[in-house]
Amino acid sequence: MVYVRYLLLVVVFGFAPAVEAQDESIDLEALYQQIDDAISQSPQYVAELEGRVTGSRDRLLREESLEKRIQIAEELFQLYSSYRNDSALHYAELCISLADSLRRPDLVGRFRSLLAYQCSNSDMDNESLEQLRLVKRSALDSLGLVDYYHAWMHVYGELGSYTQREHLRLDYFAQQDAYRDSVLMVADEGSEEWLHLKVDVLCARQLYQDALELSKEWLKKVTDGTHESAYAAFYCSMVYDRLKNHDMTCYWLGRSALDDIKCAVMNQASLLFLAEHLANDGEIDRALRYVEFAKACNLAFSPQMRAYQVNSVVNVIEKSSQVSRDQTRIILVFASVVIFLLLMALIYTIVFYRRRR
């Protein structure tokens, strides 16, 4: 996934203090405890989202106006986009059908682009390409162009990540870069699309301090506890990871994971990355709990989704666990040798004194 290429304090998370957290002491254990608590309350967060979904579905059934039906259908698509992939695909297709009934090629193209992105975000790259090739670019407005270029950028990134052929990988990533530049040209400066791509560009150029400053500005624009704040926090963690700041990387990964859980996001990524860091730090039990929760979420979002990523983290955990066992075994052997030598010394001393007597 795109994520593969490349996130709390005990007090309330105000944004100004949170953004400056790198200058303060942070309590990662308190953050992890908040994540543990949020995981235990996950059914409540899911029920809250289901309540919003039910309300929107009921309004859609009652609504007769095509214009309003398409608005509600898009609302349902957005609610499902990180919750249940099959339902998100269904409502994206409904949006396309309604837009076609309204004879709105601009909306048809935009919703096809959103459908294409949803497909490539759930390992359906061929279906994504199929939808994008049906879009009439000349009919798109500026918003539609952002979604269109963004979908192309994403699917080429996915293709580049998966292929084992080097020349194809280079070609796919070159196409991804070209569409990224197109998004930056048409997206509003300061929008979410513009911000995350700009952070990517700055990191690629190794301008990490500039990327960090932009990430701070982004965090000031989002509301704590939302999917948008989770997304911004993930990118902040990515910058700190490039800066080799382990604690701040884990901090922002934790912030991102916490918001994802509270928003009933099933398309989990941040928690998996955090679990990998924890495994490398030797916190095997907690890492396993996080992986199991993330795995269950991803299976609920889409079967087989990120299975390879879960397995990758599990492998890290197993290796860390093996290293821990090996270290324990070495310590036990060393301790046994020391005890044996001490016993031998004690026996020698006793025998020596008895002979002198």
Model-based region annotation:
Residues R5-L8, V333-F334:
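Alpha-helical transmembrane segments of integral membrane proteins
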Residues V11-V19, L346-F352:
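Short hydrophobic alpha-helical membrane-anchoring segments
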Residues S321-R357:
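Alpha-helical transmembrane signal-anchor helices
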